């Protein structure tokens, strides 16, 4: 892959991963607007890992709190005054991660292949459902539907909760929403922010909740792809490394912008963008 292609993929991923407009949808569409070949799942995961590192650095204090909660769960640091609340937040994040892990494993094992072929008339190629549903109409549909859902949740949702107020119920509901983001065009950040806003979290706290919840899921995806990285050869592995580093830079800058933007503005601009892009895809592709 050329450096230009890696740069475009990284910038698109770094921006769209954190804005609620679907990173996977934009990455899949790159070959339609350029002469570049599809970058494939390896580069997709590499840029997601770059995004993950950006989250860890930006929310380092929150990540440290969750880490202390994990240690407190195994009896380390339980004498700290904040240990009970840190432990609680840690376990609610774990609970919220389970739906995405279960859904992802089910897809990987082919549990939904027959449903996709029978109910939705989708031809599953080589038992790979995710590669088989990377098509424009599905992306457009999800951009519009989940964009409208985001707008309604942002309009009707109260702003009374912070991340520290998370209950097991909130963690599970937002976690189930996160599982839906496996489908291209949905937007992991968009669907989790939608769920959090519907539960009464402020815009800023919805984004904070969304990004912290993404850490285990994205890390897990990175771990699963490690064997493929070693099998891919040095050249492709270097491409993945470059893409990951470039994505980290773009993602960190985008996240800083978004968190400040949400302190003073609504999500309406993202709703309009999603609906407009979805309609354009249906009209021209």
From Swiss-Prot:
Membrane topology value: Multi-pass membrane protein
Gene Ontology cellular component terms for the protein in this record: plasma membrane
Molecular function (Gene Ontology), one example: undecaprenyl-diphosphatase activity
Compartment(s) of residence: Cell inner membrane
Membrane-spanning segments: 40-60, 89-109, 137-157, 171-191, 209-229, 241-261, 265-285
A Pfam entry, by short name: BacA
Record keyword Cell wall biogenesis/degradation present: yes
Similarity annotation: Belongs to the UppP family.
Other comments on record: Bacitracin is thought to be involved in the inhibition of peptidoglycan synthesis by sequestering undecaprenyl diphosphate, thereby reducing the pool of lipid carrier available.
Function: Catalyzes the dephosphorylation of undecaprenyl diphosphate (UPP). Confers resistance to bacitracin.
Name used for this protein in its record: Undecaprenyl-diphosphatase
């Amino acid at each position: 892959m050329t450096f230009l292609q890696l740069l475009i993929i990284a910038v698109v991923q770094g921006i769209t991963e954190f804005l609620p407009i679907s990173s996977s949808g934009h990455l899949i569409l790159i070959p339609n607007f350029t002469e570049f070949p599809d970058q494939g799942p390896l580069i997709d995961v590499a840029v997601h890992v770059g995004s993950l590192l950006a989250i860890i650095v930006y929310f380092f204090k929150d990540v440290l709190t969750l880490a202390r909660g994990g240690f407190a769960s195994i009896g380390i640091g339980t004498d700290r005054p904040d240990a009970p609340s840190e432990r609680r937040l840690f376990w609610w994040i774990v609970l919220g991660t389970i739906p995405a892990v279960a859904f992802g494993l089910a897809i990987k094992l082919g549990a939904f292949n027959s449903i996709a072929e029978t109910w939705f008339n989708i031809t599953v190629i080589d038992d790979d459902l995710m590669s088989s549903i990377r098509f424009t109409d599905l992306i457009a549909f999800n951009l519009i539907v989940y964009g409208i859902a985001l707008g309604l949740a942002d309009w009707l949702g109260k702003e009374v909760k912070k991340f520290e107020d998370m209950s097991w119920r909130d963690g599970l509901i937002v976690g189930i929403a996160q599982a839906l983001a496996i489908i291209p065009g949905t937007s992991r950040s968009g669907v989790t922010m939608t769920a959090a806003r519907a539960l009464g979290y402020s815009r800023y706290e919805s984004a904070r909740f969304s990004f912290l919840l993404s850490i285990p899921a994205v890390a897990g995806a990175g771990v699963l792809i490690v064997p493929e990285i070693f099998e891919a050869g040095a050249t492709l592995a270097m491409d993945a490394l470059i893409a990951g580093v470039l994505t980290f830079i773009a993602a960190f800058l985008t996240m800083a912008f978004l968190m400040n933007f949400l302190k003073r503005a609504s999500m309406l601009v993202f709703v309009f963008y999603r609906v407009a892009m979805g309609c354009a895809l249906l009209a021209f592709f």
